[in-house]
């Protein structure tokens, strides 16, 4: 009997041992860490030996750099997005420009710097800038690594969570021991903790790898503020900001002989300390400037204690000569020619500032426009001229006017706080309701220091007529003309608190007439908002629209007087 039992026991023991071994193998395979290494080129999304992955702060981006002559180059758009928007490329004349307070630095695309490297190269239809060149004018650090190619850009020095490895361990593509290995990290390696989870934490290494390590292998994360050691000091674009509030009035001058109307339009006007005559315009697409300025006009204005800020526009000759601001401003030589004319005219006439009123700038021409403002600011700064720039009420669709950069370069950024409803509007409405003006001021002062912001008010309104068939027409009239029309029709206006204006509506043989009036009461409401936001000034479009209602100027000057 015993002889029969022993073989059975041995068999059972063998079965148990086999099962235990199988279970052990299974458990080992399931829970032991994989040693399979990740394809690092695939991880960084690299195709070709010249591509460079970009790790921007704590993010592996989709954009790629270019490795050339052992230096890293980034596309112009990438430089704008991540590092510095002030670099400008003239694609027509093949130039790279950067504007400083007193000069615009210029180098040709493909041209070598004094240090013996190429500042900008053109490849595959794109212009690429050398990081070493960009760093001269920008506040960031970078480190370039190879095998695989990657560059780590640092532009953010906010407090981070850092930890150290308590033992040698693997950095993996994903959380889990079966995930591929990115790097084998040594005990004591410092990492930035990006996200804490239950068993695995997402971390970033100093050389740009972002992956996962087991939480148990990390010390407790601690706050750490990186040391900012870029060595960069932002230049001061100090201009000619006045030490008092600005009270500006535009004077529409369309022919040279109209300069003689200056004494008449100023009769009875009080409080104004700046007058801006519409003297200059872009004449054609070669960069010629048309001008009707008068030195005697400036002398008369100075005798009254007024500064003169000569206006230049981009629309006077748009229809007759096909003026296209982008075609002009996209050439450095044309921008330079325009600026030289304006500086020469300042010497000839003696005016005190320049007011830029470019209203036809498209999104495609945005970079060319703002570069013109930069370069003009240098010339004005050198000559002691005030530079002001006119803008539509800010909205998303006109953000390409780049208000924040205007606020750096120009002395004053003017909101043309009207045309909420204009001549081409399909529905009747206010030219400048209080809410519309307030929203414009609030948005502009988010990007431009309030002391540099001037809000312009309209001295006109629109008489709207809606016919029986629904057709809407309007005409712009001055303040007193609007009231005369209301009185003629024996109507009466009442205050509408929702728009901050007096409103009137009545019937005529032509249809329903609606008028949102601009008057002393509505202007006072707007001025109160301007005071609340501590703006740098007020402007009015335009002299003559007061229609003899001279007390309106006392209301306007109430802002600048405080």
What residue spans do the PLM features occupy?
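Primary recognition of N-terminal secretory signal peptides and signal-anchoring hydrophobic helices
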Residues: 2-197, 227-241
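Hydrophobic faces of well-ordered beta-strands that scaffold small-molecule active sites
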Residues: 247-251, 273-277, 308-312, 354-356, ...
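Substrate-binding surface in catalytic domains of secreted glycosidases
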Residues: 285-292, 340, 363-488
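Catalytic domains of carbohydrate-active enzymes, especially glycoside hydrolases
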Residues: 258-283, 341-354, 526-537
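Glycan-binding loop/region signatures in secreted carbohydrate-active enzymes
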Residues: 232-233, 317-318, 459-526, 556-562
């Amino acid at each position: 009997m015993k002889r029969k039992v022993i073989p059975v026991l041995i068999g059972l023991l063998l079965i148990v041992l086999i099962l235990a071994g199988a279970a052990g193998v299974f458990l080992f395979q399931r829970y032991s860490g994989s040693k399979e290494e990740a394809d690092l080129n695939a991880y960084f999304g690299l195709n070709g030996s010249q591509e460079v992955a970009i790790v921007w702060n704590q993010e592996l981006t989709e954009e790629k750099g270019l490795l050339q002559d052992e230096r890293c180059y980034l596309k112009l758009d990438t430089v704008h997005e991540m590092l510095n928007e002030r670099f400008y490329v003239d694609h027509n004349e093949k130039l790279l420009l950067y504007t400083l307070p007193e000069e615009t630095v210029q180098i040709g695309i493909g041209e070598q710097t004094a240090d013996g490297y190429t500042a900008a190269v053109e490849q595959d239809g794109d212009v690429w800038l050398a990081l070493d060149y960009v760093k001269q004018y920008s506040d960031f650090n970078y480190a370039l690594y190879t095998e695989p190619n990657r560059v780590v850009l640092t532009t953010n020095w906010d407090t981070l969570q850092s930890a150290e490895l308590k033992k040698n361990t693997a950095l993996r593509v994903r959380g889990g021991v079966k995930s591929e290995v990115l790097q084998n990290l040594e005990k004591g390696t410092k990492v930035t903790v990006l996200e804490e989870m239950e068993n695995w934490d997402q971390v970033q290494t100093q050389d740009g790898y972002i992956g996962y390590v087991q939480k148990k292998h990390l010390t407790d994360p601690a706050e750490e503020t990186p040391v900012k050691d870029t060595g960069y000091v932002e230049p001061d674009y100090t201009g000619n900001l006045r030490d008092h509030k600005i009270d500006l009035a535009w004077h529409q001058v369309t022919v040279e002989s109209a300069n003689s109307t200056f004494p008449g339009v100023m009769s009875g006007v009080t409080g104004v300390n700046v007058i801006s005559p519409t003297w200059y315009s872009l004449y054609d697409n070669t960069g010629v400037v048309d001008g009707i300025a008068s030195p005697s006009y400036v002398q008369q204005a100075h005798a009254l204690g007024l500064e003169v800020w000569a206006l230049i526009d981009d629309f006077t000759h748009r229809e007759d000569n096909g003026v296209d601001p982008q075609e002009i401003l996209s050439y450095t030589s044309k921008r330079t020619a325009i600026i030289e004319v304006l500086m020469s005219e300042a010497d000839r006439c003696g005016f005190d500032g320049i007011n830029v009123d470019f209203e036809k700038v498209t999104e495609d021409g945005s970079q060319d426009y703002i570069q013109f403002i930069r370069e003009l600011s240098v010339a004005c700064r050198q000559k002691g001229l005030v530079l002001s720039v006119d803008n539509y009420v800010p909205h998303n669709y006109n953000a390409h006017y780049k208000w924040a950069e205007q606020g750096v370069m120009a002395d004053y950024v003017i909101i043309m706080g009207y045309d909420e409803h204009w001549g081409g509007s399909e529905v009747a409405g206010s030219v400048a309701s209080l809410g519309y003006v307030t929203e414009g001021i609030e948005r502009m002062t988010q990007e431009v220091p309030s002391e540099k912001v001037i809000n312009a008010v309209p001295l006109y309104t629109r008489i709207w007529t809606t016919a029986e068939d629904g057709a809407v027409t309007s005409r712009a009239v001055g303040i007193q003309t609007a009231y005369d029309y209301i009185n003629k029709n024996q109507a009466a206006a009442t205050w509408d608190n929702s728009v901050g204006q007096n409103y009137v509506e009545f019937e005529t043989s032509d249809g329903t007439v609606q008028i949102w009036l601009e008057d002393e009461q509505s202007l006072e409401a707007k001025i109160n908002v301007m005071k609340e936001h501590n703006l740098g000034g007020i402007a009015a479009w335009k002299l003559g629209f007061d229609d003899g209602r001279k007390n309106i100027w006392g209301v306007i000057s109430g802002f600048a007087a405080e």
